[in-house]
Amino acid sequence: MSGKLYLCATPIGNLEDITLRVLRTLKEVDLIAAEDTRNSIKLLNHFDIKTPMTSYHEYNKIDKAYVLISKMQEGQNIALITDAGTPGISDPGEELAAMCYEAGIEVTSLPGPAACITALTLSGLPTRRFAFEAFLPADKKERKLILEELKNETRTIILYEAPHRLVRTLEELKETLGNRRMTLCRELTKRHETAFHTTIEELILYYQTEKPLGECVLVIEGRSRQEMEEEQKASWEKITIEEHMEIYENQGHSRKESMKMVANDRGMTKRDVYQYLINKTEE
């Protein structure tokens, strides 16, 4: 009978946040796969957990996955932990879970801390809908592409960032998204936890005199639907109604459908659009 993979969330700062279920599981499994064994040994020693460990990280995740799957196929139960937070959320775990499913091995997730959710709840920004992007890509072209995609994102946006890249990221956000409300969170769950409720522009000014310290979570206000609608309406007003009609007709819409869509875009009645086109025809 095959073993099972346990995805175990660990504290992001305060050791008291570990769950009883995770503690029991870490003691009972046959092996713990850890992102950094040097870091995780501190957690295990604190809770007097003697289970053997092996490394599983970004640079060995595929090759090591085959080794771990082989052990589970032999009946061993394995727990996966990262340096902090929930496996698979901007940390190793996604590929291992997928490969386990392909191999017919059961996977279960033991919920717990996640910096993105902790920061979101602290932000004071809308929490019902959000877009989690983790770290922006280092590649300039890919980074710019994602920022452009986020420009019209109406959901609350969550990013992770390292201190040495923070100012650059804030400047890029200001350039692409404009000056939005945001919250910057640091040292989450720790004694010196901070949450700056501010704007992108104010943070840029703040870090002109202060040195960024520690990895942080950026929670950024989504774009206002009203603002988008007003911008779109303004863009339609730059073209004639005939040109506007042509756009929709070229997309395959009937003339009747196009008139309805043009009227909606411009805040007009369908009858007004029809009358305008009739008048133009008669000129």
What are these model-predicted stretches?
Residues M1-Y59:
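Glycine-rich, flexible N-terminal cofactor/catalytic loop recognition
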Residues S2, T156, P163-E283:
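A contiguous loop/helix-start segment that scaffolds small-molecule binding in enzyme catalytic cores
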Residues I12-G13, D83-P87, P163-R165, R223-R225:
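Short glycine-rich anion-binding loops that position phosphate/pyrophosphate groups of nucleotides
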Residues L26-I32, G104-T108, T156-I157:
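Short active-site oxyanion
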